[in-house]
């Protein structure tokens, strides 16, 4: 059946009421109450992802055996192990294939989503692999150039900071596909910046100062909203 609006369970001899969410138990899922709708939503998304993975085992195994994955893992070494790459690739793929809004709220909707995803999982995983390979090549090329740029430490620090924000170790699952798809363009933009740097370092310094002023104001606002427990999609969208 559909998830109830509130869940009442008995814990340590007393009744506990909370917002229901599917909890990821590793090889299964369980329904548990949570104190806030936001917490329930976050936990439920992970639990639902696990339930999809359990119901699409053959497709998940096929992703783990995709040609080129071992070679990609060698490029990925600075971000994680081959096992971590596989886990993140599967999580990102299932997220894009299965965790589309509106999320399924009953067994029929879940079964329909599984059926729709079966034929897409391998193709979507290959798209993620192609993009990941492209990003890793661009990232490695930038790191090589930055390591030889001794005369502009402020620029190196600025670009390294941007690279760290764009490509954290879990970048495959940290960003939605519609954001990730633009990352190669951002990395190429950093390379173009380095191409122009020596000809006009003063212009780069001015642009960097203007950018930092804007970025710092954005970060202050983001932190203030986070402390207040407020999610602002418009603020996040402004980042891009």
Q: What does each of the following model-derived ranges do?
A:
Residues 1-240:
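A positional "C-terminalness" feature that preferentially activates on distal terminal regions of long
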């Amino acid at each position: 059946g559909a998830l109830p609006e509130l869940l009442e369970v008995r814990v340590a001899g007393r009744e506990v009421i909370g917002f229901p969410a599917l909890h990821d138990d590793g090889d299964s899922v369980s329904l548990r109450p949570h104190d806030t709708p936001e917490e329930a939503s976050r936990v439920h998304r992970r639990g639902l992802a696990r339930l999809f993975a359990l119901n699409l085992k053959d497709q998940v195994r096929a992703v783990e055996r995709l040609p080129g994955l071992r070679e990609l893992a060698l490029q990925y070494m600075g971000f994680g192990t081959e096992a971590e790459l596989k886990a993140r690739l599967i999580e990102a793929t299932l997220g894009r294939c299965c965790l589309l809004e509106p999320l399924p709220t009953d067994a029929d909707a879940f079964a329909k989503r599984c059926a729709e995803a079966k034929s897409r999982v391998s193709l979507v995983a290959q798209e993620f692999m192609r993009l990941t390979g492209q990003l890793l090549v661009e990232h490695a090329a930038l790191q090589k150039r930055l390591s030889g740029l001794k005369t502009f430490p402020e620029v190196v620090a600025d670009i390294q900071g941007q690279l760290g924000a764009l490509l954290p170790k879990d970048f495959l699952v940290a960003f939605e596909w519609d954001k990730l798809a633009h990352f190669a363009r951002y990395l190429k933009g950093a390379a173009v910046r380095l191409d122009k740097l020596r000809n006009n370092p003063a212009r780069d310094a001015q642009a960097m100062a203007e950018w930092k002023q804007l970025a710092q104001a954005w970060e202050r606002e983001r932190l203030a909203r986070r402390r207040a427990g407020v999610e602002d999609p418009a603020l996040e969208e402004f980042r891009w």
